[in-house]
Regions:
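N-terminal amphipathic alpha-helix/helix-capping segment at the start of soluble metabolic enzymes
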Residues: 1-24
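Conserved active-site and cofactor/substrate-binding residues in soluble primary-metabolism enzymes
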Residues: 3-8, 28-32, 70-74
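Acidic (Asp/Glu)-rich catalytic clusters
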Residues: 14-15, 38-45, 73-89
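A generic hydrophobic-helix recognition signal that picks specific residues
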Residues: 20, 89-90
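A common structural microfeature
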Residues: 23, 34-37, 45-49
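Glycine-rich, proline-tolerant flexible connector loops at the mouths of alpha/beta enzymes
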Residues: 25, 30, 48-70
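Short, glycine/acidic-enriched capping/hinge loops at junctions between secondary-structure elements
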Residues: 35-39, 60-63
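Conserved small/polar residues in nucleotide/adenosyl-binding loops
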Residues: 93-95
Length: 95
């Protein structure tokens, strides 16, 4: 499924609050950790949340560049492309 829109993400959070449960939130710092998180969500049959920390985003831009904005944009673009291949809803959080 594609990355959840803000409306779908709010529905996910409302469902969790109503059902007294939490979605797993995985900190992503590379395409490999993103794929691992998506696979884990799908294997568990659980929707989930991916989040990019400042340090993770810096790392994703390149170890000598350390541009958190570019790294976060790159990870987000990649997430949008690959998430549609998984059968779970993915919310995104900004840390």
């Amino acid at each position: 499924m594609p990355i959840a829109s803000p409306e779908i993400y709010n529905e996910m959070l409302d469902r969790a609050k109503k059902g007294a449960f939490a979605y797993p939130a995985i900190n992503v710092s590379s395409s490999q950790t993103l794929i691992a998180a998506l696979r884990g969500f799908e294997e568990a049959g659980s929707d989930g949340i991916i989040q990019f920390s400042w340090g993770g985003a810096e790392y994703a831009s390149g170890s000598t560049i350390k541009n958190a904005v570019d790294g976060a944009v790159a990870l987000a673009e990649f997430a949008h492309v690959v998430a549609k291949n998984y059968k779970v809803k993915i919310g995104r959080a900004h840390v």
